[in-house]
UniProtKB/Swiss-Prot annotation:
The presence of a 'disulfide through disulfide knot' structurally defines this protein as a knottin. Belongs to the neurotoxin 19 (CSTX) family. 03 subfamily. The keyword Signal applies. This is U1-lycotoxin-Ls1bb. Residues 21-44 form a propeptide. PROSITE patterns: SPIDER_CSTX. InterPro entries: Spider_toxin_CSTX_knottin, Spider_toxin_CSTX_Knottin_CS.
């Protein structure tokens, strides 16, 4: 009887220790996931919206509906006659075509 009681106490102790370790692992995973979501949200806040200037940060455009916007540059002649490069975030033509096809597909197939 003493052996069974001792074995039961040992079993309960091991079970509680292992469940505490599992809970710690789950808590750590939740914290890591939360930190990665916060980092993504911060990066999303710092991005440049569509049709805004991206001359100084050509890789900082935001994500559109399906694709990330690309920094598109053109050469502009100023009133003084100087040529300068101006860039804006926009959707490339091949991405526009893909979004159009997806839009038609959603309308047809619901």
């Amino acid at each position: 009887m003493k052996f069974v009681l001792l074995f039961g106490v040992l079993l309960v102790t091991l079970f509680s220790y292992s469940s505490a370790e599992m809970l710690d692992d789950f808590d750590q995973a939740d914290e890591d996931e939360l930190l990665s979501l916060i980092e993504k949200e911060e990066a999303r806040k710092d991005c440049i919206p569509k049709h805004h200037e991206c001359t100084s940060n050509k890789h900082g455009c935001c994500k559109g509906h399906l694709f990330k916007y690309k920094c598109q540059c053109t050469t502009v002649v100023t009133q003084s006659g100087e040529e300068t490069e101006r860039c804006f975030c926009g959707t490339p033509p091949h991405c526009k075509a893909a979004e159009l096809v997806v839009g038609f597909g959603k309308k047809i197939f619901g």
